């Protein structure tokens, strides 16, 4: 088998963005899962930051993971992958200068693309999440990311949460990110095709959706026609693995341990209640989410 180089995988991802068909990204998290994804016909994968947080820390997705810890996980995937892999680079692990370091490290790890989001992370004292950073600061991160890549085929994807602000602000933000040279725009929180059209009619840059399996946005032909090239439907493979591990350990132990649902398993073994209490105590922020204390939506989705 002739293996494709990281540069070739990046070129393949660029071709996908410039194509005419929407592709669904496989949620991958280790060498085995990315090889499975390739064999099952996926043309692109994504290493979710929330999944890496679970793997490394057993913690909710609240920006506790360090850059080095994330890069270690991505490197393991990058070594084995023969499909392009997108890295979830969160907020770039800091300001625009931190973004430059993040791009350099993830490029060496072998990713084909990375997303940079405009969410303010980690959450600040007494700050109700999610809060977006300023448009100019976010655009500066895109400029810095493009400047710091040594392989121009590495795609920089600007990510924004449209549910965290107004339609008008989202339009202004995505226009600024396109002007800054983002290779694609990633949207979180899109409601339906009407909402998608309103958000993207001013853009020529390819679109990526974090969709969570939204039934109102599942028509591949319509997605393709709307210039959507990548859809991420959450990280079901890893969560299914958690459920299977618990069941297998129950059987091996011969224990009469309780039958726990997936949300119950996640809550118990990521210590969600403890993090919620610590957040209230030390950040003076209350959280009502039943899935966790993540500032970016349901823990079970991303």
From Swiss-Prot:
Catalytic activity from the UniProt record: oxaloacetate + H(+) = pyruvate + CO2
Entry binding sites for substrate: 50, 159, 235
Main EC class the enzyme belongs to: lyase
Cofactor binding note of this UniProt entry: Binds 1 Mg(2+) ion per subunit.
InterPro entries in the cross-refs: ICL/PEPM, Oxaloacetate_deCOase_bac, Pyrv/PenolPyrv_kinase-like_dom, Pyrv_kinase-like_dom_sf
A GO MF label: methylisocitrate lyase activity
A single BP term in Gene Ontology: oxaloacetate metabolic process
Assigned EC number: 4.1.1.112
Pfam families xrefs: PEP_mutase
Known cofactor(s): Mg(2+)
S-S pairs: none
Keyword Metal-binding listed: yes
Positions that bind Mg(2+): 88
Keywords: Decarboxylase, Lyase, Magnesium, Metal-binding
Assembly: Homotetramer; dimer of dimers.
Family: Belongs to the isocitrate lyase/PEP mutase superfamily. Oxaloacetate decarboxylase family.
Protein name (database record): Oxaloacetate decarboxylase 2
Organism annotation: Pseudomonas putida (strain W619)
